[in-house]
A protein has these predicted regions:
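Oxyanion-binding/catalytic loops of NTP- or PPi-dependent enzymes
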Residues: 3, 12-286
Length: 286
């Protein structure tokens, strides 16, 4: 981790022209106290001064509220489908009067009311499900020509399959089907098969089945229901999978009392940059 932070510092120096040592580091909601302390030690080894740690969804919520001021209290659900986990946060935005300088004005503020998460339910889990599907497909072709074997025991071949699985997921997020081809995958055998979006969704069914659990946990922690949610903001690479968004819509519709007033899944934020931008904003105000 210290080496990664050192590399990030080198990139900053190369592009910014100055040595940057002060930083704000984002952590997942489920990071333990020991893990956070270890991260601080890693930053010290990288010769960086940590101004603050901030949870990823909180950083995104900060970035979201930068250009918004709600006259009435609003509750926004932040759904973050990353690589390793899914995190959900219920954030309440409001205003308070500020009479500083003799002027009456209102200032925006937010408070995280509830959080939930599910490890092993992110985009990487879908990659693994597709990897298993492709491995099974190759085994059928391989075993039809050779003696019984399992490509999963061949590290080099599996590395190729994992790379193909990731690309397949990305393409099927925008297309209904894709021809997958891996030349000379193993034992001089070329591998090819066509995968469809429904096949991806079936392979990743176990992952998709728990996609909404973090929302349930966040609602329970905040003592709220879906009826209390005024808006939904989705971030993270995992939300690009169409079925993930479909599952979220189905969940919100099913649990909403007024079916004609179900909040849309919004993408006001850049899902890849929002957390980093929010952390930078926090650092500028520490």
């Amino acid at each position: 981790v210290a080496m990664i932070l050192s590399y990030a510092k080198d990139i900053t120096r190369a592009y910014g022209g100055n040595v940057v040592r002060d930083c704000v580091i984002t952590v997942p909601t489920f990071a333990t106290q020991l893990e956070r302390e270890a991260l601080l030690v890693a930053a010290e080894l990288a010769d960086m001064r940590v101004l603050s740690l901030i949870e990823a969804n909180t950083a995104a919520a900060l970035q979201f509220g930068l250009d918004r001021k709600y006259e009435e209290t609003k509750v926004i659900l932040f759904y973050n489908a990353g690589s390793e986990a899914v995190q959900a946060s219920l954030v309440e935005y409001s205003t308070f009067p500020d009479k500083g300088g003799g002027k009456n004005k209102t200032v925006g503020q937010f408070e995280v009311k509830g959080k939930g998460w599910k490890k092993g339910a992110g985009g990487f889990a879908i990659d693994l499900a597709l990897t298993e599907l492709l491995a099974d497909g190759f085994n059928k072709k391989w075993n039809a020509k050779k003696q019984k074997g399992d490509v999963r025991t061949i590290p080099r071949a599996m590395a190729k399959i994992r790379a193909a699985a990731k690309k397949t997921k990305e393409v099927l997020s925008a297309n209904e089907k894709i021809p997958v081809g891996i030349p000379s995958l193993h034992d001089d055998i070329d591998f090819s098969m066509t995968l469809t979006r429904p096949e991806l969704e079936k392979a990743a069914a176990e992952v998709l089945d728990v996609a909404t659990q973090p929302i349930i946990d966040a609602l329970d922690a905040a003592n709220m229901t879906v009826d209390d949610i005024d808006g939904v903001e989705i971030i993270g690479g995992g939300v690009r999978v169409p079925r993930v968004q479909a599952v979220l819509r189905e969940f919100l519709t099913e649990r909403r009392t007024n079916k004609s007033d179900v909040p849309e899944l919004s993408v006001h934020l850049n899902g890849d940059e929002a957390v980093a931008l929010g952390a930078a904003l926090h650092g500028a105000n520490v």
